[in-house]
């Protein structure tokens, strides 16, 4: 176990040293106005090249990702119903679903699921 810990520490230190050397030896580029601005036929751009996104779009995407992970956590619970104690499985499943419903209620109550705004 000591050898595994020592090797892990050595590999971690070597990785950090290599990354620091790569950062120090890499070619530094100076950013000026031409490099930071989008190219538009050699002329200055007429308007901003970035379109504004609604923060609500990102919030809905994060909520979808969280609920997707929750579904992925619920699926194995169905598989282990045959091998586990039914009472323990029921209590664990109901507790987990209760926590998910509390989260859904909180998001609904905060208005995070409303598209009309």
UniProtKB/Swiss-Prot annotation:
It catalyses: a ubiquinone + NADH + 5 H(+)(in) = a ubiquinol + NAD(+) + 4 H(+)(out). Disulfide bonds: none annotated. It is a multi-pass membrane protein. One of its GO terms (molecular function) is NADH dehydrogenase (ubiquinone) activity. The chain crosses the membrane at residues 1-21, 58-78, 86-106. The keyword Transmembrane applies. Its EC number is 7.1.1.2. InterPro entries: NADH_UbQ/plastoQ_OxRdtase_su3, NDAH_ubi_oxred_su3_sf. It is found in: Mitochondrion membrane. It comes from the Eukaryota. GO terms for cellular component: mitochondrial membrane; respiratory chain complex I. Keywords: Electron transport, Membrane, Mitochondrion, NAD, Respiratory chain, Translocase, Transmembrane, Transmembrane helix, Transport, Ubiquinone. The keyword Transport applies. PANTHER family: NADH-UBIQUINONE OXIDOREDUCTASE CHAIN 3. Core subunit of the mitochondrial membrane respiratory chain NADH dehydrogenase (Complex I) that is believed to belong to the minimal assembly required for catalysis. Complex I functions in the transfer of electrons from NADH to the respiratory chain. The immediate electron acceptor for the enzyme is believed to be ubiquinone. Belongs to the complex I subunit 3 family. This is NADH-ubiquinone oxidoreductase chain 3. It comes from Anopheles gambiae (African malaria mosquito). The lineage of its organism: Eukaryota, Metazoa, Ecdysozoa, Arthropoda, Hexapoda. The gene is mt:ND3.
